[in-house]
C-alpha cells in the first residue's frame, strides 16, 4: 500500500475553471494522474493542487487531498475539488446519490443500433486481470446513459456520443461501451485491439459538471470545450 503523503509540486500544469472558498473546479489535461498510487508517486494533480491550494492538505483522505471524484489519467476535462471537510462531505454525498451530473464527450467504433440508450450492467474487477474492470454478475450496480450526437464515415465508421454517468465506477464508460461492442476510439485497455487511428489516448472528455454548491445549495454548471488533442483529431474526421 502507498503510505507516503503527496507533497506540493508547482510544476504540475492544469487550468482552474472556477474557485471560491469551498470548491475548486479544474480542467484536467490528458495524461495527468489524479492522485498518487503505485507507480505514480509524484507529478499528479494532487501534488499540483497542494502547491496552488495548500489549504486542501487536511481535507478528506491525506493521499487524495480534496479529491471527491476521479478521472482516468487518459481522460481530460472537469473535476471538482473540495477546500473544506464540510464541502468534501457535501460533494461526496452528491456523487453517491447521483444528484451531481457528469456528461462526457466520447467517440466510439461503429454506430449504436439505438440512438439513445441506457447501459445497465454491474461492474467489478476482471477475474483474468485485476487491473481491468469488467461486467460481472455480482459487481456493483452501474448505469451509463448515452445519446448519439453525430456519425462519421472517415477515418472509419464511428459515432460521437454524449454519455451521462448515473453511477461513477472505475473505467465505467470505457467498459460499458466496450460491452455493447462500441468501444472508445484510442482505448488501449478496452478497445478490443482496434487500430488507434492516430489517437494517443481514449477519446473521452468530461465536458460538463453540475452540482449543488456546498454553501449556497445553488445548482452550478461548468462546461469544458473538447480538449485540444481530441479537437485536432476531430477536425480531420469526415461525416
PLM region descriptions:
Residues 1-239:
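RNA pseudouridine synthases
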Amino acid at each position: 500500500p502507498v503510505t507516503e503523503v503527496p507533497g506540493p509540486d508547482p510544476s504540475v500544469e492544469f487550468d482552474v475553471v472556477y474557485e471560491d472558498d469551498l470548491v475548486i473546479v479544474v480542467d484536467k489535461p490528458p495524461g495527468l494522474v489524479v492522485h498518487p498510487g503505485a507507480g505514480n508517486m509524484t507529478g499528479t494533480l494532487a501534488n499540483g493542487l497542494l502547491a496552488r491550494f495548500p489549504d486542501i492538505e487536511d481535507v478528506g483522505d491525506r493521499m487524495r487531498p480534496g479529491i471527491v471524484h476521479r478521472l482516468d489519467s487518459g481522460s481530460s476535462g472537469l473535476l471538482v475539488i473540495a477546500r473544506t471537510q464540510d464541502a468534501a462531505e457535501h460533494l461526496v454525498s452528491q456523487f453517491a446519490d447521483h444528484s451531481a451530473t457528469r456528461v462526457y464527450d466520447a467517440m466510439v467504433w461503429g454506430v449504436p443500433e439505438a440512438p439513445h440508450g441506457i447501459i445497465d450492467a454491474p461492474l467489478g474487477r476482471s477475474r483474468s486481470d485485476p487491473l481491468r474492470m469488467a461486467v460481472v454478475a455480482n459487481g456493483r450496480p452501474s448505469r451509463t446513459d448515452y445519446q448519439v450526437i453525430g456519425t462519421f464515415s472517415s477515418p472509419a465508421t464511428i459515432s460521437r456520443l454524449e454519455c451521462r454517468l448515473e453511477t461513477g465506477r472505475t473505467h465505467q464508460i470505457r467498459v460499458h461501451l466496450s460491452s455493447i461492442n462500441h468501444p472508445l476510439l484510442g482505448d488501449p485497455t478496452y478497445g478490443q485491439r482496434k487500430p488507434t487511428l492516430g489517437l494517443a489516448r481514449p477519446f473521452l472528455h468530461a465536458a460538463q459538471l453540475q452540482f449543488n454548491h456546498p454553501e449556497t445549495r445553488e445548482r452550478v454548471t461548468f462546461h469544458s470545450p473538447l480538449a485540444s488533442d481530441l479537437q485536432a483529431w476531430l477536425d480531420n474526421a469526415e461525416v
